[in-house]
């Protein structure tokens, strides 16, 4: 099986590949944390996922560089970089053994870019923090996905993650009431935990840490992972696109 790229537009891969987009145009919503932990999960179960870092901050790429040789292998593409020694198509090629592609998107993705970004995504994970500012930005993101990218609710491609929550707070209750009105599944509610900080420092994910240390956090992740596993049973789109070129 081969995966060939067509310029900057995208790549064609096997039908067995699952593409997961982690998206929220607002910075600081936890996209990289979710993307790296997803890649870690797939790697820990014996897959060889591809983590594509489209964020100029390069946080996912730095995380990958911290990983030790004995850790489960994760392919990485620093998509935000421009390498003058190779073509863009060669730089963006998708490894033939990558069953999962996790895309860490940058902040400030424009509404008009959403149709191209989301077209071939099997799952679009949208994290949101429990704050008024974040909820407002998240609302616009969801509206853009539904109205501009034309992602239909009945496709069940969008999954919301309530991130860094403290369940006994008023703002958390407000967030959950708001999410209930959207008719879009909340696939995970992740607590505000120092385990994510430790994992980032070590270049690993929760699923690679000692279970007794992260048991509660692993339980938080299980609904989202079950949602993604259910999608693996369905045939994903053939086209695997990268983010559009930026000036």
Which role fits each region the language model picked out?
Residues 48-49, 101, 124, 156-158, ...:
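Hydrophobic anchor at the start of a short beta-strand
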Residues 198-217, 222:
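Inter-lobe coupling/hinge region of RecA-like P-loop helicase motors
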């Amino acid at each position: 099986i081969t995966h060939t790229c067509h310029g900057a537009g995208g790549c064609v891969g096997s039908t067995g590949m699952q593409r997961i987009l982690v998206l929220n145009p607002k910075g600081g919503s936890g996209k990289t944390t979710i993307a790296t932990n997803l890649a870690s999960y797939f790697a820990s179960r014996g897959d060889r996922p591809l983590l594509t870092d489209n964020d100029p901050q390069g946080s996912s790429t730095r995380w990958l560089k911290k990983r030790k040789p004995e850790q489960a292998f994760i392919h990485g593409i620093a998509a935000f970089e421009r390498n003058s020694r190779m073509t863009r198509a060669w730089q963006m090629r998708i490894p033939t053994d990558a069953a999962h592609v996790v895309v860490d998107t940058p902040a400030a993705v424009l509404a008009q870019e959403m149709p191209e970004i989301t077209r071939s995504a099997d799952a679009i994970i949208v994290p949101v923090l429990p704050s008024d500012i974040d909820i407002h930005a998240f609302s616009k993101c969801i509206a853009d996905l539904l109205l501009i990218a034309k992602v239909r609710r009945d496709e069940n491609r969008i999954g919301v993650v309530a991130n860094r929550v403290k369940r006994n707070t008023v703002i958390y209750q407000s967030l959950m009431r708001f999410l209930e009105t959207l008719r879009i599944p909340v696939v995970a509610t992740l607590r505000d935990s120092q385990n994510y900080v430790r994992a980032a420092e070590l270049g690993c994910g929760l699923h690679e840490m000692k279970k007794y240390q992260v048991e509660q956090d692993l339980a938080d992740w299980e609904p989202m992972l079950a949602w993604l596993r259910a999608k693996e049973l369905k045939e994903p789109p053939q086209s695997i696109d990268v983010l559009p070129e930026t000036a």
